[in-house]
Swiss-Prot record:
Family the entry assigns: Belongs to the gamma-glutamyl phosphate reductase family.
Subcellular location: Cytoplasm
A GO molecular-function descriptor: glutamate-5-semialdehyde dehydrogenase activity
Catalytic activity: L-glutamate 5-semialdehyde + phosphate + NADP(+) = L-glutamyl 5-phosphate + NADPH + H(+)
Name of the protein described by the UniProt record: Gamma-glutamyl phosphate reductase
Keywords: Amino-acid biosynthesis, Cytoplasm, NADP, Oxidoreductase, Proline biosynthesis
Organism, as annotated: Halothermothrix orenii (strain H 168 / OCM 544 / DSM 9562)
Function: Catalyzes the NADPH-dependent reduction of L-glutamate 5-phosphate into L-glutamate 5-semialdehyde and phosphate. The product spontaneously undergoes cyclization to form 1-pyrroline-5-carboxylate.
Length: 418
């Protein structure tokens, strides 16, 4: 079967499955999720063997340490994915919830009820955990999903998707509810872009290149997620010990994720005291700094930052540093170069903290905390399918409610419109 025919076949199958899935009871969906979690742990050796093939090929291709970390599956991570599915079971099912109801003077009762989006196309890079997370969230919310992961993770994704679909169907969910695009040929993605007859939404999750391509080329509606050129601004009235801890965590805890900080802005009044301490800590942990001219006057051993550095999502142990003359200059820089993801200020000044919250245009804005908390689980929302950086439909971590839409339900007693 040709690539186009195969993808259309899968999309048609998903559309058919979504109609059945939308009406399936919560307890059946929860039973399926629990069974998938159990099966993942049982099959961990098989999963790790498949992942080892991807890891070896990744090393041969010269993938960075950070990207290899995203690709790797081990026993602990597989158990973590299974636990994530078990947590989904505990969460309330939003499907069928009537979020408001009112009565009109003519006696009509009108309500708004949550319903699944339908068929979701998930396009993502070499992160096999997304295969499990996305499938779990879609099944819980009654959505069928077509998964297209990065070629570097193809063997891992194949085994994970097979386990998920086989177990889900055995537990009573419709065939075709979870499918993986098996080919790594990019032609398959182009086909997905145009399947408005079968797909209700595309969710790209990955770097700027992937997301921009989907936005530019897709005819299917897109929810934009996660390019994270995130900033930390150290204000003139910052607690510098706190700032050091936060900047270090935001950059180094997992540099290859979208909520990691990529740029640091430091107020001129504290730069001489703060930057040498930061440089010492980062040098000890093999983090490269790239600075503006004023930064390099204090830290002459670091690389010069060029214009491109202010807008880059490194996803690596690299950070751009700029000294700013004022709070207003920091806000201007962030709103110019940021990607509307996660931005943080470190300050003890109440007025500036609240101005930062109001003036920064981003999905998550922090005062005295690391950007690394932008995550559905960390926000208490449960698992997430991605972090939306757009303003329509959903913004920020996209959990269960964000994978639903609403429809109006109207109860009458024979009313007709005059």
């Amino acid at each position: 079967m040709e690539i186009k025919e195969q993808v259309v076949f899968q999309a048609r199958k998903a559309s058919k499955a979504s109609r059945k899935l939308s009406g399936i009871a919560t307890d059946v969906k929860n039973k399926a999720l629990a069974a998938i979690a159990e099966k993942l742990v049982q099959a961990k050796d098989e999963i790790i063997r498949a992942n080892n093939i991807d890891m070896e090929r990744g090393r041969e291709k010269g993938l960075s340490k950070a990207l290899l970390d995203r690709l790797e599956l081990n026993e602990k991570r597989i158990e973590g994915m299974a636990e994530g599915l078990k947590e989904l079971v505990k969460l309330e099912d939003p499907v069928g919830e009537v979020i408001k109801m009112w009565k009109r003077p003519n006696g009509l009762q009108i309500g708004q009820m949550r319903v699944p989006l339908g068929v979701i196309g998930m396009i993502y890079e070499a992160r096999p955990n997304v295969t499990v997370d996305a499938a779990g969230l879609c099944l819980k919310t009654g959505n069928a999903v077509i998964l297209r992961g990065g070629s570097e993770a193809i063997n891992s994704n194949k085994i994970l998707a097979r386990i998920i679909e086989d177990t889900a169907v055995a537990a009573g969910l419709p065939e075709g509810c979870v499918q993986l695009i098996q080919t790594t040929d990019r032609k398959a993605v182009k086909v997905l872009f145009n399947l408005t007859e079968y797909l209700d939404v595309l969710i790209p999750r990955g770097g700027a290149g992937l997301i921009n391509r989907v936005i530019a080329e897709a005819k299917v509606p897109v929810i934009q997620t996660g390019v994270g050129n995130c900033h930390v601004y150290v204000d003139s009235e910052a607690d510098l010990d706190m700032a050091l801890d936060i900047v270090f965590n935001a950059k180094t805890s997992r540099p290859a994720v979208c909520n990691a900080a990529e740029s640091l802005l430091v107020h001129r009044q504290v730069a001489d005291e703060f930057l040498p301490e930061l440089y010492k800590l980062f040098r000890e942990n093999n983090v490269e700094l790239r600075g503006c001219e004023n930064t390099r006057a204090i830290l002459p051993g670091i690389k010069k930052a060029v214009d491109d550095d202010w807008s880059r999502e490194y996803l690596d142990y690299i950070m751009a540093v700029k000294i700013v003359d004022s709070f207003d200059k920091a806000v201007e820089h962030i709103n110019t170069y940021g990607t509307k993801h996660s931005e943080a200020i470190i300050t003890e000044n109440y007025t500036r903290a609240h101005r930062f919250l109001q003036e920064i245009d981003a999905a998550a804005v922090y005062v005295n905390a690391s950007t690394r908390f932008t995550d559905g689980g960390q926000f208490g929302l449960g698992a997430e399918i991605g972090i939306s950086t757009q303003k329509l439909h959903a913004r920020g971590p996209m959990g269960l409610e964000e994978l639903t839409t609403t429809k109006y339900i109207i109860f009458g007693q024979g009313q007709i419109r005059e």
